[in-house]
């Protein structure tokens, strides 16, 4: 969560956040004393985990400075979508592995076997599905999350839990994922179409400021959804589907549980808004190129938008202006065609 900078004079927001988290974890009536906390941090008796640093505000990132001699934390774990420099301190970096194309079938087979579902498929059906997934991602390495989502859809289709065929592109896979979450809800539920519309709206609310998956103001999100039932619909996505989660000291922010889902849903929002209007797309590309930390910080979103464009615009091709520019910008080579 973001740091709360409205603390008493002389207090450090980072330390105060740690104190608050410890009080919550230990269920104590009073927060731990500053002296004891500082000693525990110094002796590495507390491991501090800063999750999703790359998606936090610049103010919060600036407050986490392990290179400074007075930085209070001696055991720090940071998760980020970027290779954080952290002031040049000595660090150990671990990265999640992606699945190379020649390993896809073995990974998929292992996952389905672990779920006890491999016997649902003949060898022909299984390898056909692997080929289809490889076509969907093209020349990119495949993430574990994407493979899992696709395998789960394979199982759902085979067991009759869905009436649709397997998706043939990643944006459709994300919408299928929403449908499966919705199907698991008992009792009264939102229609799939309403769910898609609301999730796409919330995803854009979370990405529109920085083009990175981040937390959005809860009240602003409710206003974006619109209608008398907006708050209850937001709670449905949070409490029934676990698609979003509430964050912040005052529970005033919401964010998506899975970043790639947020990126693809926000990409669908852009395609719906801009369609084939090149002037709007040029403005978007210019704004994307000027984003702090671009292109690495927003590469996932740019490629998601490209996939959404190719999937949703009739007759769209890789060589068209928009997908070509999105790919080039996402790969860090800037815009090929200057905007007027």
Over which residues does each language-model region extend?
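Short acidic, S/G/P-rich loop/turn micro-motifs used as interaction or catalytic elements
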Residues: 3-8, 53-57, 85
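Post-nucleotide-binding-loop coupling segment downstream of the phosphate-binding loop, primarily
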Residues: 1-39, 43
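Conserved P-loop NTPase "ATPase switch" module shared by AAA+ and STAND
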Residues: 39-60
């Amino acid at each position: 969560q973001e740091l709360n900078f409205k603390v008493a004079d002389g207090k450090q927001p980072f330390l105060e956040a740690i104190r608050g988290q410890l009080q919550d974890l230990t269920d104590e009536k009073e927060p731990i004393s500053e002296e004891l906390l500082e000693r525990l941090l110094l002796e590495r008796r507390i491991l501090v985990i800063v999750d999703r640093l790359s998606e936090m505000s610049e103010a919060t990132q600036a407050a986490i400075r392990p290179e400074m001699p007075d930085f209070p934390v001696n055991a720090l774990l940071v998760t980020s979508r970027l290779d954080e420099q952290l002031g040049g301190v000595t660090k150990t970096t671990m990265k999640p592995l992606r699945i190379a194309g020649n390993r896809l079938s073995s990974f998929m087979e292992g996952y389905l076997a672990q779920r006890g579902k491999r016997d649902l498929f003949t060898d022909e059906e299984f390898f056909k599905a692997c080929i289809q997934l490889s076509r969907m991602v093209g020349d990119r390495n495949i993430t574990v999350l994407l493979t899992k989502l696709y395998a789960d859809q394979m199982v759902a289709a085979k067991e009759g839990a869905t009436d649709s065929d397997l998706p043939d592109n990643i944006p459709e896979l994300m919408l299928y994922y929403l449908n499966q979450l919705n199907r698991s809800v008992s009792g009264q539920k939102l229609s799939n179409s309403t769910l898609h519309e609301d999730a796409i709206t919330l995803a854009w609310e979370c990405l529109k400021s920085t083009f990175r998956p981040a937390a959005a103001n809860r009240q602003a999100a409710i206003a974006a959804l619109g209608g008398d039932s907006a708050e209850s619909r937001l709670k449905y996505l949070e409490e029934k589907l676990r698609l979003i989660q509430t964050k912040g000291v005052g529970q005033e922010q919401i964010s998506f549980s899975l970043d790639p889902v947020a990126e693809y849903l926000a990409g669908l929002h852009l395609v719906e808004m801009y369609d084939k209007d090149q002037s709007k797309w040029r403005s978007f590309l210019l704004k994307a190129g000027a984003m702090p930390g671009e292109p690495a910080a927003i590469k996932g979103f740019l490629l998601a938008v490209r996939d959404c464009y190719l999937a949703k615009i009739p007759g769209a091709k890789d060589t068209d202006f928009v997908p070509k520019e999105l790919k080039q910008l996402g790969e860090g080579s800037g815009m090929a065609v200057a905007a007027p």
